[in-house]
Amino acid sequence: MVQRWLYSTNAKDIAVLYFMLAIFSGMAGTAMSLIIRLELAAPGSQYLHGNSQLFNGAPTSAYISLMRTALVLWIINRYLKHMTNSVGANFTGTMACHKTPMISVGGVKCYMVRLTNFLQVFIRITISSYHLDMVKQVWLFYVEVIRLWFIVLDSTGSVKKMKDTNNTKGNTKSEGSTERGNSGVDRGMVVPNTQMKMRFLNQVRYYSVNNNLKMGKDTNIELSKDTSTSDLLEFEKLVMDNMNEENMNNNLLSIMKNVDMLMLAYNRIKSKPGNMTPGTTLETLDGMNMMYLNKLSNELGTGKFKFKPMRMVNIPKPKGGMRPLSVGNPRDKIVQEVMRMILDTIFDKKMSTHSHGFRKNMSCQTAIWEVRNMFGGSNWFIEVDLKKCFDTISHDLIIKELKRYISDKGFIDLVYKLLRAGYIDEKGTYHKPMLGLPQGSLISPILCNIVMTLVDNWLEDYINLYNKGKVKKQHPTYKKLSRMIAKAKMFSTRLKLHKERAKGPTFIYNDPNFKRMKYVRYADDILIGVLGSKNDCKMIKRDLNNFLNSLGLTMNEEKTLITCATETPARFLGYNISITPLKRMPTVTKTIRGKTIRSRNTTRPIINAPIRDIINKLATNGYCKHNKNGRMGVPTRVGRWTYEEPRTIINNYKALGRGILNYYKLATNYKRLRERIYYVLYYSCVLTLASKYRLKTMSKTIKKFGYNLNIIENDKLIANFPRNTFDNIKKIENHGMFMYMSEAKVTDPFEYIDSIKYMLPTAKANFNKPCSICNSTIDVEMHHVKQLHRGMLKATKDYITGRMITMNRKQIPLCKQCHIKTHKNKFKNMGPGM
């Protein structure tokens, strides 16, 4: 029975074993508790004496607790051989124990990998011990245990086929099913039964760190000769090392050339429509295969990889002028994505909490929310705008900042190659820039953030110097009336004085001895809130301009504005931000130092959506118009959509409305904006449908489709535009709603590692699937489409495209021959029987 419990991977057997252990632990704990209670009742007389008393020997130091934890873990690692993720187990972390060392996946040694996610717990203990400045030997021992755990947990399984020679049912296939829900690769684990016969178990993760595994005589294991992938061990180590912000990073190029990292990067960018747009060559992500990734890995390892020049196009700015945009080679973006992941891992924790642009779990909304929470009480705003920030950043400054934390010359050279790759303009002329970041590169935003972190550090130091005073000084009139109230004996006199005092200010509005400064940055847009005088704002603007000039950046004097917070709203990230005037602030009764006073309560900033500007933007794009009599936002038809299906027309309008309202759901005037947006988009949709069906009037259209614009197909409602379409987009009222509904969530490094590892099996499976048409496994590559339109399903005659729309897949594996035939429309008008 004991052997059954120890060797079984059945959930019930393991549950019984754990239940017995729990009972034993409870009995032992009860006995120890009884002894301690007896000692406490009559100390120093019965069981243990003096300093040897049991309750005195309990560990009271964090150091002793950590050392004992290490001792227990060492004993487990030394004497307990086990496997993880058992078949039929209730949850990940249930382990089956084994005595024979030959079955250990580590070969010679077997280490504890996971027990109720204990790896994360132990790493956190390690970090705690680091901050507690533990003994050096204990710290080194912890690091070694962590390293050995990583080897077992994270190394790629190099086993391709495992077969039980005693199995009479035939060979066990290693190819995985390609059905949805399966990662595409069936993993296996060697688990012995009581007779020590090896079995192959499907869908159990197998970790291998050594090709020279010690196995039983009857075990037949074919090892893969491909050792080019090492899973994500090095990247995970990079994540853990950079929890220390002063860490110097090396061997980054070895992470870059890892095929698994390249595969993961491809998987992250493959569905973006822009990656089907060619750059200066005709190559896109269409036709991607493992051969190209292996070639890319070799070029990165040997230093032969070069970024191709980008294609430069000019797009108009909303307020006039043209913005240059670089269109890069889609296949170069695979390398850029790996670089972005590495740079993000190294530098994100070093950036300011006031920086919200192009960062994980940061967005425009988190920046606006910080303004809402932190800028109350400001009486001046400084809207800082940098002139062509991306185009004027010095390459030498970028490299200098990278070298502060990166010592890998190969990686630095790769960044330098990207910066100097150049571009080809619309006339076909090649340019090699000496300044600036290519707008369109995946790593340009984070490189900009790295440089702008210098500005963040300067502003934070400046704030510490500028802020002064603890509390505002009370207004003389307020103090005078307070003394009169204290001396007044008649109730009517007191009431009269109270009313007179409430009309005036409580504190000196511009107290020279009380100053405050706040700031928020999103990329190159900075908003500074100042509690002080206008001269202070001019001084801040001048000093900031001087510092920007020292970095080679230029402040746009025309767009950098100093505005009175209570009179003129500041425009930041599309919101109008203002402060409630002092006279309109609500009054509240407070007790300060035993005295009851009535003061005006400072309110949060008013964050309004610029409804007039939004309507003007809709008018520019043809959704509404302005009448000659001055009426704004009169809905009109959208002629370019009259050729679409009615379902597509309605869904386009709803998507536009959701996009606007989701962005402005922090606005104080959100409900008014929602009603206005619904009015314009709904009646514009009605007029567009009227134009499509030549119904001439809105009343005839509503009579045909109903007030909710119900589109029915085969007695099934497929689209509508009801009155409550946008009611599910709620205005964010408080911080709890914001944390729940927005992107402002703290990223745990362990969760980040797990999320990346979760994506890797799926990415690998895509390249291991056979051709979706002929089921061939030779020369399989990925067929890409730029967009999938559900409305095209009936109109398309291409069976392959129709199936991709039905499956909602932008990529499918095809062999070389079928891929060529697909692009030549050879499968047109064919059906499932092809």
UniProtKB/Swiss-Prot annotation:
Domain Reverse transcriptase: 296-577
Gene Ontology terms: biological process: homing of group II introns; mRNA processing; RNA-templated DNA biosynthetic process
Entries under Gene3D superfamilies matching the protein: Cytochrome c oxidase-like, subunit I domain
Biased composition (Polar residues): 167-181
The keyword Mitochondrion is assigned to this record: yes
Cellular compartments per GO CC: mitochondrion
Region span, Disordered: 162-188
Identification of the protein by name: Putative COX1/OXI3 intron 1 protein
Gene, per the UniProt record: AI1
